[in-house]
Every structure is written in structure tokens, then in C-alpha cells.
Amino acid sequence: MNNYAFQKLSLSIETLRFPLILTIVFLHCYTSTSAVTRGHDIFFRLIYPLSLWLGETGVPAFFFISGLLLFYSKKTYVQKLKSRFHTLLIPYLFFNGMILCCYLCLIYFGKTILIAGKDLSDYSLIDYLRAFWDRGTWDSGNGSPVLCPFWYIRNLIILVVLSPLLYYILKYTKLIFPVIFGLIWINSHDSAYTFQSLTMFSLGAYFPICDRNLVELFERYKVLFVGSFFFFAIMDFLHLCVSIPFALPFHRLSLVANTFFFISFFGIFLYRHHIYSSFLSKSSFFVFCIHYPFTTYLRPLFERINGLNDIILVVTYLLSVVCVTLICVLVYKILKSIMPGFVTIITGNRV
């Protein structure tokens, strides 16, 4: 890839960091309350484009970007590991440890904390250590650490460690490898975290490893990429109105189409029209790290208003996303102003 194309791609990715994190906030504001709002069909149909169609795009897109950037880098394997130690492992250990400490404080004041059905006060040393990995249940790869969204960082760390192996696999199999795991992912009826991670990370890695220019590819086949984006979006939304076969595969294929569309078109569009904030981009990883605990407080709120009409639920949901995001950004701004060095460390030098 030439310097111009790489710069264009880098600008798109940088511009998209906060919008993609925002999609994850949309997702978790929904999943934290979905058990309460079940049965509100109008509510579900109205928020689906934001909560699940866009909401479930964020993590696959970040896996794709991570694979793309890791192999575009000219650093050695050891240098990449050192870099990811700061950008991934330190934040992973810090924020999971912080959540455990908060839980222990709540236990001290008489609260009962259950994690995966087990009382935290009964935890052994092994249980505490395992809480950093999967909270005591691996669940075929769908288990998450004590800070649930960090399954993404856990899987990304594993993929970075295995990157030399993935390099040779992709060098000789090219798209065959991500396509095989992609077929398993789109047809898996559980969350399929492992297959999602492998599919999107290896798909992103394919471009630099096999010397394919993503920007040039999009410009050459723009009609195909844009057409796929709209086709899979329509097929995904269609199941809201009628029962269709292969609804889940269409949904997951739409996540792949969204990823290509956002990186190759939408990010560039935002940058060219100056719809971009450097501050918000820098805050995005911190927002990802702390947003989830705030979303868990939404369930009692939705339990109180569950009897109201669906439009009120939709408005409450949208306001919840705005409030959670603003709180996280405000906390970031305050901490950055009073403890900039500390924020730099816990966010992996992303400030």
C-alpha cells in the first residue's frame, strides 16, 4: 500500500474510533435491559438499528482494524508484544482488578455479590485469578472476565501472541482461513466469540499480509461494497417484520459489510466534512473500559417504567446512551486534567 492510501486509511480509522465505541454503548444499554423489555415488540423494532445492527458492529470492526494495523506495522514481533503489553495487558489487568476491588468494598458494607452464580465472598485465590479470564465459566469460548466487555481484549491478546502462526496460515491459505471460520461464526447460534475474533482479525490481517490495498479495492469495487452494505442491512431488518430463513447469518454478514463500509467510506466522509473530535477519539478507549458498570444501573430504571408505552421506553433508551457516554467522557476529562500520567498508563498510552 502506498503512503497516500495508508494515510487515508489511518485517518478513517482514527475518525471512527469514537463512533465505533458509541455503537458498543448502544449495544450494552440494550443488553443490560433486554430481560426487562422483552415483549415490547415496537420498542425492539425501533431501537434494533442502533442497539444490534450498529451495536454489534463495533467489536467485529475493532478486530478487523486490529488485524489490519498489526500486520501493516514494520515492527518486529518482540516490539509488537512490548507495545501490546502497554496498550492491552496493563489496561486489561487494571480495569478488571478495579472492578474486583469495587465488589470487595460492597461486600465489606454488607452487599452480596454473585458472579456467574457464585458468591464472591466464597471465592478462593484460584477463583479470583480466574475472574480475570472467564469468571469461572468458559462456555465454549463465550465466557468473559469480571469486566464483561473485556473478552474482546482477552481474545485480542491471544491473537497478538499467535500472530506469527496466523501470518504463515494467511500467507498460504489467503482468504480460505477467514472464510472457513466466518462460515462457522455466521451459523453459530451462540455468541461465538472465538469464531468472531478469528474471522474478523484474520480478515483484517489478510490485506497487509497478502499485499492487498483495501482503499484501492474499495474504490475499484465501490458499487459492490455499497450494494452489499444496503442489501445485508435490508435483509437484516426484514426479519423484524416477517419470518425469514437464515436471519442470523444475514445479521452477521451485515456486520462484515458494515465494517468494510464504515472503514472505506464512512470514516473518510466524517473526516472530510470535519465531523470529528480529536478529544473524543482519544477518550474512546477509556469510555470502552468504564461504560459497562454504568449500563447495569439501567435495569432498575427500566423495571420502574416497564408498564409505560414503547415510545417512552425508546426515548429512555436513547437518553440512557447519551447519559452513560457523557458520564464516561466527563470522568475521562476530569482524570486527564488532574492525573494525566495515570490516565496515560491505564489507557495504554492512548492520550
Give residue ranges: language-model regions.
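Membrane-cytosol interface segments of multi-pass membrane proteins
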Residues: 1-181, 305-351
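Alpha-helical transmembrane segments and terminal signal-anchor/GPI-anchor hydrophobic tails
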Residues: 4, 199-202, 210-286, 292-302, ...
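Hydrophobic residues within membrane-embedded alpha-helical segments of Major Facilitator Superfamily
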Residues: 23-26, 61-63, 200, 207, ...
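Aromatic-anchored segments of alpha-helical transmembrane domains
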Residues: 26-29, 96-97, 178-192, 227-241, ...
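Interfacial loop-to-helix transition and helix-capping segments at the boundaries
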Residues: 47-59, 141-154, 185-202, 236-262
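Short glycine/serine- and small hydrophobic-enriched flexible loop segments
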Residues: 68-72, 167, 205, 209, ...
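Loop-centered beta-sheet repeat module
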Residues: 162-211
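Transmembrane alpha-helical segments of multi-pass membrane transport proteins and ion-pumping complexes
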Residues: 205, 260, 296, 325-333
